Amino acid sequence: GHIELAKPVYHPGFIKKVKKVLEIVCHNCSKVLADESDPEFVTAINTRDPKLRFKRVWAVCKKKRKCENEDRQDKNKDEEFAPGAKNVVLEGHGGCGNMQPQVRQAALQLKAAFEVTSEEGPKRKETVNISAEMAHGILRRISERDLHNIGLNSDYARPEWMIITVLPVPPPPVRPSISMDGTGTGMRNEDDLTYKLGDIIRANGNVKQAIREGSPQHIARDFEELLQYHVATY
């Protein structure tokens, strides 16, 4: 069977990978931050081994702090008529122009650190929590072409699958009840997995109830964190 979670939660085994993917793509339009006008990026996406390709693309993109949206056609107008110049049409990046945060991981949470420039004072850093739901939304919108470029397989390894939305539950024969005194005749008690599943179901019910009743933000967040904890320790 399975448990449908009220809110997505991070998978403790994949949270580092999710963090890296979030450093590669724009948090607003889900485009890869680098494009083919960058020779480093071109070299990176021409790597045959997908794992290595992911690593190289990540190294190029993690330095970028803006999703570029300028049109490159205008820049090359003067060079068009230079003798012997080949007319190469560069496709614009077509991003959204938003600034990109630095992604930080703290245990089972991801945080986005933005640099905010205020009119009077120096730059200051603002940290926003990236909920699993937000991350899931960003990862879900990545295009097939971008997935191929960053070395993920869209049939078998879509990035949004690294975030748990539905939790598989093993059937009872896999988690039989255990004898308390070791003789097999005395008191019988539920298996650890069954207890943990009970915790997850209760935490999930609390989150559902908080959403249904429109509870205050901080209460709903506490319940979500509890659900995240129980799923991670399952």
Task: Set out the residue ranges of the language-model regions.
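Conserved core architecture of multi-subunit DNA-directed RNA polymerases
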Residues: G1-Y234
